[in-house]
Amino acid sequence: MKLIWLGHGGFRLETGETTLLIDPWLTGNPMLEDSQHDAATQGATHILLTHAHFDHVADVLELAKHLSVPIVGQYDLMGYWGETEGVQTVGFNKGGTVTVGDTRVSMVPASHSNTFSTRDGLRTAGSEVGYMIRAEGKTLYVSGDTDIMADMDWMGDYYKPEIGILSAGGHFTMDMKAAAYAAQRYFAFKTVIPCHYRTFPLLEQSAQDLIDGLPGVNVIEPQIMKDIEL
């Protein structure tokens, strides 16, 4: 299983014949060069969304049409886009599990907000969520944008993810210290990968507090468009 950071909260996850684009933000992403867009998206089979804020979905509709791939995400938003945008969607909700290519994806809670812009102004897009992704005998937790929450207790106990992708840049999500606390208290990760940081000056620029707070855990600071073998 191979993971590639696209900057901010975006990732490319490759497993078997399946390539998931998770919250891919390309246009306007200061961390990703325009010349890297094709490599970031080529061969994708599905798009997986945690919520509808612009820095997670700005390119999603165009990508889904260009690549002819389904968008997988929260039921309310998928239903709306399926009706209004003519894209393939797979909508489900918290507690649900769907087969996405070679993976099994379970939707879990997050603690954030979830709106998107339309010609008529802001519109709510159902709940913000995270995912537990099972592939190649491993379980990977994608937190999405979130703060620490009590739900992490049962999520860690029930799904037992070995790998955590945690939004940890602060201001809009938990920061590195909070992410370390959540990981240590609620999960038994072997590997943690921070994201949603370094993008803007108001976000944290280093994962050192996460590293310091998780002795014995393999904390990987991702680099743009560089492979991480999981």
UniProtKB/Swiss-Prot annotation:
Record's keyword annotation contains DNA-binding: no
InterPro entries documented for this protein: Metallo-B-lactamas (IPR001279), RibonucZ/Hydroxyglut_hydro (IPR036866), UPF0173 (IPR022877), UPF0173_UPF0282_UlaG_hydrolase (IPR050114)
Sample GO molecular function, one term: hydrolase activity
UniProt KW keywords: Hydrolase
Signal peptide (residue range): none
NCBIfam families attached to this UniProt entry: PRK00685.1
Family: Belongs to the UPF0173 family.
PANTHER family from the UniProt entry: UPF0173 METAL-DEPENDENT HYDROLASE MJ1163, UPF0173 METAL-DEPENDENT HYDROLASE MJ1163-RELATED
Protein name: UPF0173 metal-dependent hydrolase TM1040_1920
